[in-house]
Amino acid sequence: TAETHLDPTLLISADEWKKIAVSKIDKPYILIFTANPAVSLVDFALKLSKEKNLPVYCINDAPHPVSHGINYIVAPTVEEFVGCFKNAEYVVTNSFHGTAFSVIFNKNLFVEFKNKSGRNIRSEGLLKSLGIDREIVDGNCNETEINWDIINAQLKTLGSKSKKYLSEIVNME
């Protein structure tokens, strides 16, 4: 069987990521970040916005707004991108890195695994390995409890294993 290891994004601690994070938003919000544009995620985020009474921000590389009721963060710098996740109250995503940064910063996250281009197996695998059940299915997701103390301990263990593996590969003759 193939051995799996953490994505390098997850090998850097939240404290290290926080050092570069820059945020221009100073109030609680819901963040949308998509690898593939998805109306279903926008709809889910807008529904969550009504429930939680929070504004929605969407990281987007397009210069024009796409949906009414959403604030767009267009082409953020790396520091702003990281800051968007660090300061979000909730994250709605179908992206592996959206999932990873949500986990790094211990965010209330909701992830859509299935989309038009297939299944996001990297996000699915990461969340299942950590025992997080926050999949959006047919526009719905239960806000199950996430015990971040347990998950952070698991991440630390998995990170040590991954770093050891990388060190062994780099030091091979």
Give residue spans per PLM region.
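Active-site anion-handling motifs in enzyme catalytic cores
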Residues: T1-E173
